Amino acid sequence: MPKKKGFTPLPYLASIVFLPWWVSLSFNKSLEPWVTNWWNTRQSETFLNDIQERNVLERFIELEELFLLDEMLKENPETRMKNLRIGIHNETIQLVKTDNEYHLHTILHFSTNIICFAILSVYSILGNEELVILNSWVQEFLYNLSDTIKAFSILLVTDLWIGFHSPHGWELMIGSVYNDFGLAHNEQIISGLVSTFPVILDTIVKYWIFHYLNRVSPSLVVIYHSMND
């Protein structure tokens, strides 16, 4: 395949990886004051789903019980109720501030995710020729590797993503995606995804090895199975 004159894959690949992150970070910093001002001046209603509302209520009850216990241990009963009301009021304000920060974090991260997706979409449309050339560079690089290195790389990647220790990594990654999109942490859903994704990927990898590698490079499959055993 003819390569574009003067095209080098590494700078282009670096731009694909780092430019969306840099632009989204810049937008995040520039949008933060505006979003904060809009939320504080025009937001008259708090939007909470059932899980978030239950978490906020549980945190408030826990703080109220701890503060009440602290006041009961004090020796002066005359100022106990006054301090209790003041303390609960202050804790309520703190919970509201924490909730506002959570919603601002959700809005900003959701906006930056959309910006990253838009930038990558523009890259795929306008830089289609560069992507084709980059793909040819990658294929040429992989073709020049020995079968042993290829088998070792496949085994390493599959063990990282679908191996015995992969569920913890999947849990962290899915939790990070949940936080980025402002979704409430739900152990049941995350556990279901963690137990499902590795199985699906394992099936896809086995099908790819059986259907593609057996036809293209039987020796690579033999080396892979020898390492895996």
UniProtKB/Swiss-Prot annotation:
Pfam families: CemA. It catalyses: K(+)(in) + H(+)(out) = K(+)(out) + H(+)(in). Keywords: Antiport, Chloroplast, Hydrogen ion transport, Ion transport, Membrane, Plastid, Plastid inner membrane, Potassium, Potassium transport, Transmembrane, Transmembrane helix, Transport. Contributes to K(+)/H(+) antiport activity by supporting proton efflux to control proton extrusion and homeostasis in chloroplasts in a light-dependent manner to modulate photosynthesis. Prevents excessive induction of non-photochemical quenching (NPQ) under continuous-light conditions. Indirectly promotes efficient inorganic carbon uptake into chloroplasts. This is Potassium/proton antiporter CemA. Belongs to the CemA family. The keyword Transport applies. The keyword RNA-binding does not apply. One of its GO terms (biological process) is potassium ion transport. One of its GO terms (cellular component) is chloroplast inner membrane.
